[in-house]
Amino acid sequence: MMQTKKPDWLRIRIKANQSVEEVIKLLKDLSLHTVCQEAQCPNIFECFSKKTATFLILGDVCTRNCTFCDVKKGKPQEVDKNEPKKIAEAVKVLNLSYVVVTSVTRDDLEDGGAEHFANVIEKIKELNPQTKVEVLIPDFNGDEKAIYKVVSARPDVLSHNVETVPRLYPTVRSKADYERSLSVLKVAKKMDNRIYTKSGLMVGLGETKEEVKEVLKNLRSVGCDFVTIGQYLSPSKQHYPVIEYIHPNVFEEYKEYAISIGFKHVMSAPLVRSSYLAEETTKII
């Protein structure tokens, strides 16, 4: 049964300040996109006020049509060859010690944009040698050569989200494949076990507790180090509906379970998103 009324624990107070305005202006001046803005993240004001952002590369138009996602779909733009330099400059201006880079899925590109990811990582590290870099990558259609391009650039954390339980893939992620997503994480770890791997999933889409715990076990079986779990919030009535608002106690239960089976870092709460407080992993890496 679909739920429509948000519970109190999902209500957040929006507080804009000078730091938020500075980040927004910088992004606009450099013609950069963030997933914070494109995906209507509920934590955008908190993160921007700390001068942190998750950069969205390869444009803001996705070639896939996942029913949960608010990023634009359609025919993507040409790849901006200057984007790696612009992002590296933004990282320097914002004085970031930890940066997250993600992208839309670009099935129209031969390597899915893997080389561009590598260029961004390398340029950030060239201009900001002390900055830790996390990349949240698409599945590259399982292309191991593409995955290797990203791994070879030596990100500190390589993340790929499974998003939901396998039973719900046909309706939530129809162009994706659960086993392929697990394989991305497995292959990346095998290519370079010095890189930490990470994944994330949303709950409230109609999954069961047992299914969530099975996904966590599957992630650990491929060597995944970090995991995030957050409440799914439907962007509009045209998107996949929220089936259930999960109580904070259940998120705590998932966190305890994930830690018990060996995850090194777990973020599990209603407003958690895959890049939320990602810099906390610096205590580990």
Swiss-Prot record:
Pathway: Protein modification; protein lipoylation via endogenous pathway; protein N(6)-(lipoyl)lysine from octanoyl-[acyl-carrier-protein]: step 2/2. Residues 48-264 form the Radical SAM core domain. Its EC number is 2.8.1.8. The keyword Nucleus does not apply. It comes from the Bacteria. PROSITE patterns: RADICAL_SAM. It is an enzyme of class 2 (transferase). Its main location: cytoplasm. Keywords: 4Fe-4S, Cytoplasm, Iron, Iron-sulfur, Metal-binding, S-adenosyl-L-methionine, Transferase. It is found in: Cytoplasm. [4Fe-4S] cluster 1 binds at C36, C41, C47, S275. GO terms for molecular function: 4 iron, 4 sulfur cluster binding; lipoate synthase activity; metal ion binding. Its cofactor is [4Fe-4S] cluster. Binds 2 [4Fe-4S] clusters per subunit. One cluster is coordinated with 3 cysteines and an exchangeable S-adenosyl-L-methionine. Belongs to the radical SAM superfamily. Lipoyl synthase family. This is Lipoyl synthase. It comes from Caldicellulosiruptor saccharolyticus (strain ATCC 43494 / DSM 8903 / Tp8T 6331). The gene is lipA.
